[in-house]
Structures are given as C-alpha cells and as structure tokens.
From Swiss-Prot:
One Gene Ontology molecular-function label: transmembrane transporter activity
GO BP annotations, alphabetical order: carboxylic acid transport
Membrane topology: Multi-pass membrane protein
Gene, per the UniProt record: aaeB
UniProt-recorded name of the protein: p-hydroxybenzoic acid efflux pump subunit AaeB
Keyword annotations: Cell inner membrane, Cell membrane, Membrane, Transmembrane, Transmembrane helix, Transport
Pfam families in alphabetical order: FUSC (PF04632)
Task of the protein: Forms an efflux pump with AaeA. Could function as a metabolic relief valve, allowing to eliminate certain compounds when they accumulate to high levels in the cell.
Signal sequence, start to end: none
Record keyword Transport present: yes
Entries under NCBIfam families matching the protein: PRK10631.1 (NF007916)
Species this chain originates from: Edwardsiella tarda (strain FL6-60)
GO-annotated cellular components: plasma membrane
Length: 648
C-alpha cells in the first residue's frame, strides 16, 4: 500500500497534468477561451478531492464529468431558447435567466446530493452565455458550441490524466467494507441481545447506517469506473437492501428483548454473546447459528432472529461474489430475483428547496439590475459569481462555510493572479514550456492543499484560473484584470450576505415532515401485497437525512427506527384484509402526510389512531392471534404517544 504522502503527490500530479494538457490542446485547436477547458479540468478533478479529503476514486471523476456535460448542455439550450425568443427585450431576458438559475437551484435541492451538481450548473451556464453575448447576440450559437466543446475537452483531459497516472479504483474500498459487513452486523446483534448499553447500540446502528449509505455511493462510482463490474454492482444493490434489513431485524430483536427478556432460548443467547473479533470468526459464528437453528427447528423463536440468520447467510454469499466478481450462480440469482426494486419517494425538503431557489433568484436579479443601472464593467462577473456561489453553496451541508470558502479563494486569488497576470504570464509568452511550468506550479500547490480540505484552497484554484486571461491570442489589459478580480470578490461577498440575510428556518419543519413520512410508510405496510413495494431503502434515506439535520437528537432517531421496525413487521404479517377499514386508514394517513394546516393534520392523526385501534379490535373479534396484532397495537400507541413530534 502506498504511503498517504505519495498518494497526495500523485493526485497533485494528476491535477497538474489535466490542467496543462487542457490548455495545450485548447491552444492547439485554436479555441477562443482555453480558460474554460482548464477550469473544467480543475473542477472535475479537484471538486471530488476536496469533498473526499484525499485522492478521489476514478469513478467519482467520471461521474462528476458526466454531470458537468449534462448541466452545460441544458444551460446552453436554455440560453439559445431565451435569446431566440427575447432578443429584443434584453432586460426581460436577463431577468428570466436569473429566474432559470433560481428554478435550477430549487430543483437541485430536491434531487439526490450526487446529482444536484448538474442542475446547479445548468442554471448559471445559461446566465454566463447570455451575458457574454449581449453585445453580439448573433454569435450565441458559436459561443454555446465552443463552451460545450471546451467543457468536454477539459473533462477528457481530467479522465486521461487520471488514467495515465494510476487511477484509484474504488473496488479495494468496496471489498474492505463488504468484507467487514458481517462482523459489524453480528456485533450489532450482540449489543441488541444484551440490551444493557443503549448508547453502544445507538453507536452501532449509526455506524452501520452510514456504512450502508457510503456503500450505495461507492456502487455508483464502481459502475462508471469500468465495464468489468456489472455483476458486482448487481450484488452491491442487493447487499444494500440486505444490510438495512439486518439492521432492522436487530432493532426488532432489541425491542423484543426489552419487552420479553426470555424470548430467546438460552443456547442462542450463549452463542450470540460469545465475542468475535475477525470476519473469519463472524463467518464461523454464522455457521454455528445456522446449525443451532436447524437443530432447534425454529419453534418458539422470534421471527426476527430467524430472518436475521437467513439474511446474514444471503449477505455472506453475495459478499463472496462481490470480492471474486465471478459469474452469478443459481443461489445468488434467486436472491437477486427476490430483491424487489426500491421505491422512490419525493423529497421531504420542499420548503428548504424553495428557500434555496429564492436565494439564487433574488441575489442574481438584484445583481443584474444593479449592473444594468450602474453600467459597471465588472457587474457581469459579479452577477455570475453570485449565481455560482448561491447555486453550489446551498446544496452543501454547511452553505455558510462553502460561501466563505469561495470568498477566501477570491481574496487569495487577487494577489496570486496579479503576480501571474503582470509578471509571470507576459514573461512566458515566447515559450510554451515556461507557460506550462508556471501554471503547473500553481496547480500542484493547490492540488496538495485541496486534499487537506484547506479553507479557500478550491476557491483559490478556480478563482485564479478564472481571472487569468487564458485566451487565444493572449492580451494583458490591466483594467480587465482589476475589473474581473474585484467583481469576483464583491460577487462572493454579496452571495454570502444573501445567504446570511435570507435565513433558512425549515429544519424543524423538515424534521416533522420526515417523521410523518416514516409513519406513513409504516401504515402503508398494511396495504395489499401488490402495492407494498420495497420501501426500506427509501425509509432509511429519510432516516439518514434526519440524522444529518438532528445529529444529537437520540430520541427522534430511536422513534424513527421504531417506525421502520414496525413497517417491516407489518409488511411481513398475515393480517386478515378488511378493505373498508384499510381504505379509511390509508385516507387518514394520506391526509396526515399531505394536509395543510396543523388542525387538519391533528384531525387526520386522531382518525388514523382511532382507525388502527378499531381495526385491531375487529381482528380480535374475528379470532386473530395476539402475536400478529402486537405490531398494530404498537403502531397506534407510538402515533398517539409521539403526536407532538409528528405535529409540532
């Protein structure tokens, strides 16, 4: 294994090669603004490195590149459409561009974090193209095509540099995580069966949920890394669902042990409690549990434990297939065929997304009006920086710190860019080698700092490349540099002011929406078999978002896990069907989820709890077993007891 310093040096060399190669090819092909291709190579390679805090995986660079291509094409098409329709009304055209940027930011806040970059980019790409062509609108098609071509060139250079200098495959990290998955699940089961240390159980649950979420992200990166891994990706998709199922089963055993400490027979308690330290020991323990289950016959055992042993056996089989990447066998094919496609649900951050879109639209519109009113030369650059910062920063976990990173980068880029613009670049005009060496030194230093997640490092690299006039041919008017540099700084500052002024107070509202969605998912498990679907991955995504918004709220976290456990228990229960009562329960749950106003939601929750209780009483009169009705009673009790969390 390479030393971490060697890995950091390797990525810095990759970043340098990508930027220098994009510039050389840009000058060779006679592109008008090779700066765009260099900036693209820098952002595609350095962006994932800053997010990961180290050298990014090869698949992450390719994924980022595809998102940038999609966003650029969408933004270019929007710019062409606006220019064709509103060429005679430039003010209205610019304001509609600002509205488009706001809409794209709003939509990017509703999609998954991994895909938000494409929508955010398409918003300010349209603004860049329209602003650049205001003086010569007849060249907008040429400018849009050139921008798309330079973006593709920069991405190709970033991918080529990563491929030439030993790409970092995500497969090794996937094998490490998958290899230790059974051990982690068994340790969680031990803590749940013991049940004395609730904090240790919470830590184990939290760690496994984050590990499963990370594994799902690595699967997307592995799929783009090479065409050798489609079988591994199929297995990883099933492993993700199996991991979440085992976590839920362990949580169910924990709740069962707290209610009935004698639910598990003594031989199972003794075997589970024995310590395990390595994945090999965990595999041997699983085989012992299977033998004990076969000898015991499954009589008087909690269904959760039987399901856990069965799921762990499937997980171990798929984990071996991921490591070897061999052809999918008959038993694996049966497991993969049984794994239903996960259901997609809408984002719970609608209010948060609306605020983000409002921030971008308001900031860019005010910047555009000020620019058109004042005639300031740097106004267009300032407005574009406002759009860039507000579009990208609001989708990060900490928008304020992301905006500060942009601001610090633009401030550092001012003296660094001045040195290059006034001294270094004019002195290297007669030698292409010296030009590449001078820019390579800057990108190498920034590449080392980006991997340390140094505040302002990524902003410095992007801002410096943006204000340097890397055009063909190159000219060095000092007024242009000063306007561009000052416009960048003021744009980042105004974007930070807008983020601080337009407060986002939707955290509590989003938390209540997430809890209501988890409750709705538990109630939805009462539907017929054909309409249930695989809700488990979607429910855990809601839980992961809940953990991100409320990292220290253990009570809310436990309540969410309880609702997920009840959803699984109800989904696998064999309750008699009462179509009329189930329709009433489903209608009340829908009103609880989508109802406007606290009074309506309060009434819907009362109808829901009453309907669940009536349904349970009706089943008792029909002679249903008490064990089958237990999750139904628990769900009604949880919804009534925690109505304050659901309604606020």
């Amino acid at each position: 294994m390479l030393h971490p310093r060697v890995i950091r040096l390797r990525f810095a060399c990759k970043l340098t090669l990508a930027i220098v190669l994009s510039l050389l090819l840009g000058f060779y092909f006679g592109l008008q603004t090779p700066r765009w291709s260099a900036l693209t190579a820098a952002l595609v390679a350095a962006g994932p490195a800053f997010a990961a805090g180290g050298e990014p995986f090869a698949g992450a660079i390719r994924y980022r590149g595809w998102l940038r291509i999609i966003g650029t094409v969408l933004g270019s098409l929007c710019a062409l459409l606006l220019m064709m329709l509103l060429i005679r009304a430039p003010l209205l055209m610019i304001l509609l561009c600002c509205l488009w940027a706001g809409v794209c930011t709003w939509l990017s806040s509703l999609v998954r974090m991994e895909n938000a970059y494409a929508l955010g980019l398409s918003g300010y790409t349209a603004l860049i193209i329209v602003v650049s062509c205001l003086g010569e609108p007849q060249f907008i098609l040429q400018l849009a095509l050139e921008r798309c071509g330079e973006i593709v060139l920069g991405i190709a250079c970033a991918v080529l540099a990563d491929t030439l200098l030993a790409p970092r495959s995500v497969k090794g990290e996937v094998d490490r995580v998958v290899g230790g998955m059974l051990l982690g699940q068994l340790c969680l089961l031990q803590r749940c069966v013991d049940g004395r240390d609730s904090d240790a159980v919470d830590r184990s649950w939290h760690g496994l949920i984050r590990e499963s979420h990370t594994l799902e992200g690595m699967r997307a990166s592995l799929a783009l890394e090479s065409s050798r891994w489609p079988r591994a990706c199929r297995r990883l998709a099933a492993l993700h669902t199996l991991s979440l199922t085992l976590i839920t089963r362990a949580c169910e055993i924990f709740l069962t042990q707290r209610q009935t400490p004698t639910a598990l027979p003594a031989p199972f308690l003794t075997l589970i409690a024995a310590p395990v330290k390595t994945p090999a020991e965990a595999y041997q323990r699983l085989k012992q549990l299977r033998r004990l289950l076969a000898a015991h016959g499954g009589h008087q055992l909690p269904p959760a434990l039987i399901g856990w042993i069965d799921g762990a056996s499937q997980l171990q089989l798929l984990a071996k297939g991921v490591a070897s990447n061999v052809r999918i066998g008959r038993h694996e094919a049966a497991i993969l065929a049984h794994d239903a496609a996960p259901r997609q649900i809408y984002s719970a951050q609608g209010h948060h997304a609306l605020i983000n879109g409002l921030r971008t639209w308001l900031a860019t519109s005010l910047g555009a009006l000020f620019w058109l009113w004042s005639g300031w030369n740097a106004g267009s650059g300032c407005m574009i920086m406002i759009a860039v910062v507000t579009s990208l920063a609001v989708r990060t976990p900490n928008p304020r710190m992301a905006a500060i990173d942009f601001l610090m980068g633009s401030l550092v880029a001012l003296p660094v860019g001045a040195l290059y613009y006034t001294v270094i670049l004019p002195a290297t005009q007669q030698s292409l080698v010296l030009l590449c060496l001078s820019l390579g030194a800057l990108t190498f230093i920034c590449g080392m700092e980006v991997q340390k997640r140094r505040l302002g490092s990524l902003g410095t690299l992007a801002s410096t490349l943006n204000i340097l006039v890397l055009s063909n041919p190159m000219r060095f008017p000092i007024e242009s540099f000063v306007d561009s540099a000052i416009g960048q700084v003021i744009g980042c500052l105004l974007a930070l002011v807008v983020l601080l002024a337009v407060r986002d107070r939707s955290r509590a509202r989003t938390g209540r929406t997430l809890m209501r969605r988890l409750a709705f998912g538990a109630v939805a498990a009462l539907r017929g078999e054909g309409t249930r679907g695989n809700l488990l991955p979607a429910l855990y995504r809601q839980l992961f978002l809940l953990l991100t918004l409320f990292p220290d709220d253990i009570g809310r976290y436990r309540l969410a896990l309880t609702l997920i456990v009840l959803q699984q228990r109800l989904a696998h229960s064999a309750l008699p069907c009462d179509a009329e009562r189930l329709r009433a329960i489903d209608a009340a749950a829908t009103r609880l989820l989508t109802g406007r106003g606290a009074a309506r939601r309060r009434g819907a929750l009362l109808q829901l709890t009453t309907g669940l209780s009536d349904y349970a009483d009706a089943l008792v009169r029909q002679g249903a077993a008490g064990a089958a009705l237990q999750p139904l009673h628990q769900l009604a009790d949880v919804l009534h007891r925690y109505r304050g969390v659901l309604l606020g």
